[in-house]
């Protein structure tokens, strides 16, 4: 980032979520050299100071505004389970919002797509949702949204919804859902903040940690 600054320009690092992975290659003071680093939790602030070389004066604790509207009590049961996996950099659409035929073919052949199609179309899942009268909403990371149509197997049951970011609001889904299933996404902090149950589906942890983000 140093190469993109104007002379004497001050830079502030704002986050979209709490840091949980090793991002030293991009945020270390020796690399990015931010004048101010905004953190969301006291333990995160401590980690940024101790691990990434920022001073207590330059690393400030403000909280995270995306938590402000999250209720601390979940009194109404919605009978809804939310699945929100994060993206994999090796199967992203170059365009960002539209996937080409070739990119979709690569995506469909990847373990990520195959495992979620298998899960979403599971007979056991369908029977369980019907037994307990639950709806399952599948809302993948926005980088996966261009491939939403690749999860066609999920359409075998009306109890599974493929949620597009054009039609569904992330925070509303988080608030309304009774349970979250994710993988390596920091979205689990939002659900933990609301003290609601979570489960982790990490079938490709070794590949993810080896070629995406280190823990």
PLM features: residue spans?
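Active-site and donor-binding regions of nucleotide-sugar-utilizing enzymes
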Residues: 1-71
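A short, gly/pro- and small-residue-rich
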Residues: 2-18, 100-109, 195-207
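Structural alpha-helical scaffold elements that stabilize or flank donor/cofactor-binding regions
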Residues: 4, 30, 128, 172-173
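Structural motif
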Residues: 10, 36, 80, 135, ...
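Helix N-cap/beta->alpha junction signal
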Residues: 40-43, 140-142, 184
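Catalytic binding pocket for nucleotide-activated donors in carbohydrate/polymer assembly enzymes
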Residues: 55-56, 155, 186-215
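Conserved catalytic-core segment of nucleotide-activated headgroup transferases in glycan assembly
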Residues: 65-152
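Donor nucleotide-activated moiety binding/catalytic core segment of transferases
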Residues: 143-189
């Amino acid at each position: 980032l140093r190469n993109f600054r104007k002379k004497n320009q001050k830079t502030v690092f704002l986050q979209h979520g709490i840091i949980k992975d090793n991002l030293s290659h991009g945020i270390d003071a020796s690399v990015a050299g931010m004048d101010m680093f905004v953190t969301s939790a006291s333990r995160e602030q401590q980690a940024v100071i101790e691990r990434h070389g920022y001073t207590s004066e330059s690393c400030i604790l403000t909280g995270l505004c995306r938590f402000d509207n999250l209720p601390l009590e979940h009194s109404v049961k919605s009978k809804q389970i939310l699945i929100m996996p994060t993206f994999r950099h090796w199967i992203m659409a170059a365009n960002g919002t539209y996937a080409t035929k070739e990119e979709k073919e690569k995506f469909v052949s990847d373990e990520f797509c195959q495992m979620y199609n298998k899960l979403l179309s599971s007979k056991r899942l369908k029977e369980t949702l019907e037994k307990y009268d639950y709806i399952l909403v599948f809302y993948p990371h926005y980088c996966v949204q261009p491939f939403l149509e690749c999860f066609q197997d999920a359409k075998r049951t009306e109890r599974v919804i493929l949620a597009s970011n054009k039609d569904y609001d992330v925070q509303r889904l988080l608030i309304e859902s009774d349970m979250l299933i994710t993988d390596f996404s920091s979205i689990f902090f939002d659900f933990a903040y609301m003290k609601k149950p979570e489960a982790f589906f990490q079938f490709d942890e070794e590949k993810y940690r080896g070629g995406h983000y280190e823990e």
